[in-house]
Each structure stands twice: as C-alpha cells, then as structure tokens.
A protein has these predicted regions:
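Extended Gly/Ser/Thr-rich low-complexity repeat segments
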Residues: 106-121
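Short, hydrophobic/proline-enriched secondary-structure or compact coil segments at domain edges
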Residues: 93-105
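Short, Lys/Arg-rich flexible segments
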Residues: 2-96, 117-158
Length: 158
C-alpha cells in the first residue's frame, strides 16, 4: 500500500525566485478503511499526515544533502537549503517542501538546478553535465518513505 505520493518540481515564483522542491501529499488506496479504524479510536488524521510528511521530508532532505556532497555541493547550496516544515493548506491538504530555496540564497538554488539538470556549453565555463543528484535522491528514498509512512499508520491504527 502506498501512503504518500511525492513529486519533484522546479518552480519559478514571480518576484520570489526559484524553489527546487519535493512536494508530498497523503494518498491512501484503502483510505476509507483507515479512516474507519481511526474514527473507532477517535483519532484525528491531521497529526498523522503531518508526522508522515515530516519524517518523509527529513529522510529525503538528508538523502539530497548526501547526494549533493558527491556532486559539487557548494556553500551557496548549503545556505539555500530548506528545513522541512509541514504546512496545513486546508482541512485535507498538507505540504512539506524539501530542497533548496532561492529566497535564502538565489545562487544556491540556481546552482542546485544547474548541477541537477546541467547547462548548455558556454564560452566562459564550458558545459556542466547533468548529475540528476536531486532526482536520484528522491527515487532512492521512495522505499524508505513508504516504510516509515506505513509504520506510522499501522502504529496509530492498532
């Protein structure tokens, strides 16, 4: 059973710079069954979703950092690193970002994009080959995220 659906995005926010993020949302296949179990125990799903997203984001951010070290991790990238925080959008939606934020350091977020996707050949600096360090880190943590989410839900639903 997959508990959370995650997807990777590079966003340009008008006037607010670039954000390299992993977005995660709670998506359960047996959602009705889970809700019924939690309702019987008078459990609220909001704290469960927050905990699942936070722990998933922490695992993912750690993997991104480890992968970035191997692929030319710069001081600017360290300064632009996002500290994962779960935000509640509405009653049923939560968001937790990981990656690099240009609001903290624009050069760091841009460096992360260039190291991940590469650049075309340039006269001054040559071509930067794509490493896909961000994308690989997200894919490599998929099973860990699923396992921790499953563990959290099963603990609460017992």
């Amino acid at each position: 059973m997959e508990y959370a659906k995650c997807f990777f995005s590079v966003q340009s926010s008008k006037g607010r710079g670039w954000h390299v993020t992993l977005k995660a949302s709670l998506v359960t296949k047996d959602f009705q069954e889970l809700i019924e179990k939690l309702a019987k125990k008078n459990k609220d799903i909001a704290p469960i979703a927050k905990k699942m997203l936070k722990e998933s984001a922490d695992i993912t951010q750690t993997a991104i950092n480890q992968s970035a070290i191997i692929h030319n991790y710069s001081r600017q990238m360290i300064e632009s690193e996002i500290t994962p925080v779960v935000e509640q959008i509405n009653d049923f939606s939560f968001r937790c970002k990981v990656g690099f934020d240009s609001n903290k350091n624009n050069n760091g977020a841009m460096h992360a994009i260039f190291v991940n996707y590469g650049t075309p050949k340039r006269k001054e600096h040559g071509k930067v080959e794509a490493t896909f360090f961000f994308t690989k880190a997200i894919k490599q943590t998929a099973s860990k995220r699923k396992a921790i989410q499953k563990k959290i839900v099963e603990e609460v639903a017992r």
